[in-house]
């Protein structure tokens, strides 16, 4: 059963439809990149998957026992979030809030936070203040926090915005490793078409007048890709 099955979905807000007739499936272990024009509804789709907004029409179904609160979400960072005055460990542990019972975090949750930091190679930063870290280090911390929330699905919204090219390339490799080694399904919104076709298994290309969904190979052969990329093959 697919983790997410989207059939004939239209999305919008304040009476404005921004995406029409979306059709795609996300299976366990997939790495789906969502690309496309500005204003085509990519972030709106993310909000719908998270249950923050309703679909205007169609069906967006979650399978394999996946619950919205079990999605590990890494949003776009703003200035206030970058200046958050907490330790790295506290930020990572906050990823367990959705499963927290009672006043205190459990021993198992604390162990999960430690394991997530180890996966992202940030254990030595655990006592550092989050706002003192570099942009790349902060994104690793936030990804570790997202891992605390899920064993099934990571949802990443433009996770490399503002990072330099070297750090960006490293972050993409980390995400791919998490997908391959730990079997965690990844959905990522990205404007980086080159990295999308080189790391993902599937592409959802959103346009104002429709969408394309398929494997990376199918996408590279499509007219949608050729028109959007200017006819250049990036992979």
Predicted regions mapped to residue ranges:
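Conserved ABC ATPase "signature" region
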Residues: 107-125
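Conserved ABC ATPase signature
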Residues: 129-133, 137
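Catalytic Walker B motif of ABC-type/P-loop ATPase nucleotide-binding domains
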Residues: 154-158
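Helix N-cap at the start of a conserved alpha-helix in ABC-type nucleotide-binding domains
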Residues: 165-167
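H-loop/switch region of ABC-family ATPase nucleotide-binding domains
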Residues: 190-191
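H-loop (His-switch) and adjacent beta-strand-loop-beta switch element
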Residues: 202-216
């Amino acid at each position: 059963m697919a983790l997410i099955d989207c059939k004939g979905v239209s999305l919008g807000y304040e009476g404005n439809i921004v995406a029409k007739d979306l059709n795609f499936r996300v299976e366990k272990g997939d790495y789906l990149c969502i690309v496309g024009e500005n204003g085509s509804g990519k972030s709106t789709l993310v909000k719908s998957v998270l249950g923050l907004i309703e679909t205007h029409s169609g069906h967006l179904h979650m399978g394999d026992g996946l619950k919205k609160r079990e999605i590990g979400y890494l949003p776009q960072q703003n200035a206030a979030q970058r200046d958050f005055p907490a330790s790295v460990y506290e930020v990572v542990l906050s990823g367990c809030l959705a499963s927290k019972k009672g006043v205190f975090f459990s021993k198992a949750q604390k162990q999960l936070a430690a394991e997530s930091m180890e996966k992202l190679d940030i254990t030595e930063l655990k006592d550092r203040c989050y706002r003192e870290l570099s942009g790349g280090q902060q994104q690793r911390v936030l990804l570790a926090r997202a891992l605390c929330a899920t064993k099934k699905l990571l949802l990443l919204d433009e996770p490399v915005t503002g990072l330099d090219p070297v750090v960006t390339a490293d972050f993409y490799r980390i995400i791919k490793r998490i997908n391959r080694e730990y079997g965690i399904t990844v959905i990522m919104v990205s404007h980086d078409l080159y990295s999308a076709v080189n790391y993902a298994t599937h592409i959802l290309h959103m346009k104002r007048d429709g969408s394309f969904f398929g494997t990376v190979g199918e996408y590279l052969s499509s007219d949608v890709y050729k028109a959007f990329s200017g006819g250049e093959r990036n992979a």
